[in-house]
Structure formats: C-alpha cells, structure tokens
C-alpha cells in the first residue's frame, strides 16, 4: 500500500470570517439607499493607505490585468461568476451557469468558500488561499487575478459578495474589480479595505497547475496540491508537484506526492523512477522505500520489491506496521 506524508492536511477551510454561522449566508444583493449611506459613512473610517503603499514598495505603483474575462452576475450568483472569471483567465472557459450546481447552496442563497476551492480543484486548477494587502498586491503584480470576499453591508447586517481584483493604482488610491454587473469597477482603496476587512481579508488565486503563486509558501502550496489529489486530478497534481520541486528541490513531501500521483495515474514506470530517486535523496525515509516496493511489486520486480520493503521495515518509524504489511504481502506472492 502506498502512503503519503501528511505533514499538511487537506483544506478544511478557514472559512468563517465572522466566527458565526451568519458568515455562511453570503449574499450578492444590491444595497438599498439607506445601506449605501451607511456604507459610505463607515467607509470614512480611518484606514492606513500607507500600509498598502509600503507593501508595494518593490512592486509597480499601478498594474492592471486585461486578460480576465467578465461575467455579469445574476442574483445571488457572485460565487459562480467570480470563479468563472478566474477559471477563464487560467485557460478554462466555463460559464457561470455551469458552475452554479458545484458552488451555490440554494438554501443559503450563496456560495461557501470551501465549495469555491473544491470546484476550482475539480477543474484541475491549483486553488491557493491568500490573506492581506501584501499578498494581494504581489499576486496582482505577478499577473494573477484574485477572488476576494467582501462584506458590502455592516458587521450586523452582512451582505457577502465575491469579486475579482484585476488591478490597482496606489497613487490614485484605487483598486480595479470585476464586480457584480460592473466590468473594471474603480473602487476607492479605503472603501475596498473596509469591505474586505469584514471578510477577514480572504482571497483565492486560481492557477494552472504548472504555475506557482507569487506568494507561494511550501506547506501551504503542497496542501493546495493535495486538494488536486483528493479531486483525482492526477495529471494536474503531477504538474503542480513538478512546479513545487522547481522551487523546493529538497521537499520530501513533493517527491512522494509526485511518485504517488504517477502511480494513481497508472504510470508505474514514472512512479518507479521518481520513488527510486526519492530513496536516494532521502535514504532515512521509510515511506519512500515502502512505496517503491509496492510499485516494483506491481511491475513483477519481486526481488527488488522485497529488498525495498525490508529496508522500509528496517528503518522503522510510526508507519512500521504498515511497512510490515507491505513486506508480508510481497513475501506471500514470492516463490
């Protein structure tokens, strides 16, 4: 049996910005005149524009993406519309209506963040969560649109809304959004910061699997790639693990993930090559030898498989009982 190293967990979702169940009632409504007035008043609260400018010290002062398609949302459909825009930019042309069954919860009249993430992964895309101005600006400057969750209402009257950030101009103190029914919506940075803050600065980058996020961190990125495995998107997972290894050459988890993804795809030869290389680079890791033994055995290379399985048991560790099962399975099949 093949084993993966779960030094990171599949995304369960830091998805509750308010800490209350009302967070999940994401709405995409037009504000009434009264609420607009309240929002404008609240938008005048002090926010440090300098913080945004400091985050962009090494970035262009302004940047706009012109390759993100725009889909005007229908009522309550900001989730499907935003995801369709991000997927379209990544090279997958999918209409919002086709995404609605995957992300929209009719009883809530909205889309949950985990559903947005899961849908992106089912379509073979790396869904990478970010948070805060620094990450947002870096991703935009790298040419990556970012889905954001805003509360266009107030903390006690939430109006949840997904939009796609496609640009910024820090000199003019604005961000540029595909939002609602408005293409390239110019929004005051002060107002955007307030509405985004109420969503705990949650953002989502949706990328082709061979492309790393500008703000990628090893464990967070590999957790996102595990999501592709969970979605059985093996070809995409292979591309994403290769991208990870181009950045983190000594990542044991990326090596194991790549080998396991080849195995799941039925490409035993490539799985063997990757796992053999992994045992040489990480000779103290029993999982690598155990998985190599399984792949060798399934190719009929029983003596080599026995050697690898015995070595895994010799190395021991918390999974030694599983390694022993692999060894016994191979021994039972070996004359």
Question: What residue spans do the PLM features occupy?
Answer:
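Conserved active-site-adjacent core of cysteine acyl-enzyme catalytic domains
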Residues: 45-69, 89, 94, 98-208, ...
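N-terminal compositionally biased, intrinsically disordered segments and leader/signal-like regions
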Residues: 8, 16-19, 279, 335
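Active-site-adjacent structural segments surrounding the nucleophilic cysteine of cysteine proteases
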Residues: 43-109, 152, 171, 218-221, ...
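Bacterial N-terminal signal peptides that target proteins for export
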Residues: 5, 14-34
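Bacterial N-terminal signal peptides
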Residues: 32-42
């Amino acid at each position: 049996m093949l084993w993966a190293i779960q030094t990171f967990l599949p995304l369960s979702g830091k998805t509750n910005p308010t800490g209350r169940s009302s967070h999940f009632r994401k709405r995409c409504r037009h504000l009434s005149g009264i609420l607009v007035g309240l929002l404008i008043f609240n938008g005048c609260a002090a926010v440090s524009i300098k913080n945004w400018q400091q985050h962009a010290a090494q970035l262009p002062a302004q940047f706009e993406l012109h390759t993100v398609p725009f889909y005007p949302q229908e009522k309550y459909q900001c989730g499907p519309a935003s995801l369709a825009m991000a997927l379209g930019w990544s090279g997958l042309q999918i209409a919002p209506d086709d995404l609605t069954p995957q992300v929209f919860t009719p009883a809530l009249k909205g889309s949950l963040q985990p559903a947005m993430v899961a849908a992106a992964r089912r379509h073979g895309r790396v869904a990478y969560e970010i948070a805060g101005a620094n990450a947002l600006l870096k991703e935009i400057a790298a040419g990556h649109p970012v889905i954001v969750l805003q509360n266009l209402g107030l903390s006690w009257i939430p109006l949840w809304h997904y939009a796609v950030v496609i640009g910024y101009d820090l000199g003019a103190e604005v961000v540029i959004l595909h939002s609602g029914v408005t293409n390239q919506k110019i929004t005051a940075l002060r107002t955007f910061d307030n509405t985004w803050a109420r969503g705990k600065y949650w953002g989502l980058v949706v990328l082709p699997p061979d492309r790393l996020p500008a703000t990628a961190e090893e464990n967070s990125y590999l957790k996102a790639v595990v999501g592709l495995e969970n979605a059985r998107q093996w070809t995409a997972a292979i591309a994403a693990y290769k991208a990870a290894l181009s950045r983190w050459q000594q990542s044991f988890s990326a090596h194991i993930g790549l080998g396991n993804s080849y195995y799941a795809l039925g490409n035993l030869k490539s799985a063997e090559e990757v796992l053999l290389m992994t045992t040489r680079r990480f000779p103290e890791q029993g999982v690598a030898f155990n998985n190599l033994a399984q792949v060798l055995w399934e190719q009929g290379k029983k003596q080599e498989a026995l050697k690898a399985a015995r070595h895994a048991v010799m190395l021991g560790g918390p999974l030694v009982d599983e390694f022993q099962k692999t060894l016994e399975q191979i021994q039972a099949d070996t004359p």
